[in-house]
């Protein structure tokens, strides 16, 4: 992954350490976006205490650089994006930058379901990244039960390997 990806989404310190070790072996520093769970229970650190614990440990991983925070909503736990749960990323970025000296610039506010907040002009300032692959590739926002204008919905089928799994 380190060889091919220019950044990765991470949730577990064990995986972050392994990524760091791989990056060091390759003479690289691999950028990571730390995922924060805001209630959907799909992925990410859960709660400020767990976030602080993992942030301190990331400082000891020389092969990675924490460049962003992200969240995923509208998936497993049916939590939809809101001004409140996306604003959490802005608040946590400011906290981590201040307390730990990170220079977090990327705030990844979700998937195609977050587009609705953007379209309505309600996406909090500071959210500067959305992972809209489903929208681009499949032409849909499944949580809003809508098709995205101008996109095809039958372009291909996709298969992938699961590389991280955790029970919450």
Question: What residues fall within each predicted segment?
Answer:
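Active-site anion/phosphate-binding pocket segments in diverse small-molecule metabolic enzymes
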Residues: 14, 83-168
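Active-site-proximal beta-alpha core segment in soluble small-molecule metabolic enzymes
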Residues: 1-91, 95, 99-100
């Amino acid at each position: 992954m380190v060889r091919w990806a220019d950044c990765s989404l991470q949730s577990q310190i064990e995986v972050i350490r392994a990524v760091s070790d791989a990056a060091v072996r390759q003479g690289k520093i691999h950028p990571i976006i730390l995922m924060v769970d805001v209630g959907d229970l799909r992925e990410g650190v859960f709660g400020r205490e767990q976030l602080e614990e993992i942030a301190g440990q990331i400082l000891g991983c020389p092969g990675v650089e924490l460049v962003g925070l992200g969240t995923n909503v509208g998936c497993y736990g049916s939590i939809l994006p809101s001004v409140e749960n996306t604003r959490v990323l802005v608040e946590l970025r400011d906290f981590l930058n201040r307390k730990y000296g990170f220079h977090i610039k990327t705030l990844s506010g979700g998937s195609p379901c977050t587009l609705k907040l953007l379209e309505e002009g309600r996406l909090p300032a500071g959210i500067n990244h959305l992972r809209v692959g489903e929208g681009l590739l499949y032409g849909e926002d499944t949580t809003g039960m809508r098709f995205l204008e101008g996109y095809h919905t039958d372009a291909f089928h996709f298969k992938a390997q699961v590389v991280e799994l955790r029970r919450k």
